Amino acid sequence: MNKKSFCWLLLGLVILCIAFLVKSQQTTQLDHTNYLQNTRPTLFFHGYGSSANAEKHMTDTAKKAGVTETVITANVANDGQVKLTGTIPKGAVNPIIKVEYQNNRTPDPKVISHYAYQVVKKLQDTYHFKEMNVVAHSMGNMSVLYYLLEHGSDENLPKIVKQVAIANHVAGLEGMNLPQGLALDSQTGKPSSMNEQYQQLLGLREVYPENQIDVLNIYGDIGGETDGSVLNISSKALRYLFLQILMSRKSLMKLMSSQTMFWAIRWTKVKSNKP
């Protein structure tokens, strides 16, 4: 290949690369119409025995939909030391932090609460956030709940504005620590029986931030009021820890007009008509 041909080939490759980059930027362009443009970060907490890879599908979907262009990872070592991989640029819109615990199988309340605190403190010290959202799956919910139990009233930490609980098992897991014959009061949502875990979390009724957090509780139903691993009744028990705190402090009328909202979504398995 002569020098002239090589130059033309190089020029062609450069043009292709530029075209690819432009296309990539177009596909990840922020959607200013359908999504709120905010600099508040959202933290994703994975479940038992899992990792940040489990959060990748959701974060990739968020990027493709134009929700954000910024996703970083917070890796938490066994001793609680946090390493941030990636950078959140100043003014980044809806940045996401995938949280990963190296010790991803411990249910110890003090440990998982400390891990969550260390992540929040690291992000606060690095980026000076004053607010945040949290999304947690399965065991990740326990980490968030115990964090709130210990630090929910700490005004020196970033405030949680929105909390999404996916497949939470706050009342216990069937065959492990879920009370037999568990039922929820139709009016208050109070469980008929409480295991040690739930009794500990009752403290949330005293420290859970008032008029601050919007909660979305998501649980699946493949039939039989279960998602296959967690019974719906265990997930529904979350309501008593959050919503009823307002009833203990205010009248019911004030509760109905409260700024704090609690939504519950049940995903059901749809039977296919295909053979």
Locate the predicted segments by residue.
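Lipid deacylating catalytic domains
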Residues: 6-9, 19-135, 142-275
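N-terminal Sec-pathway targeting helices
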Residues: 1-14
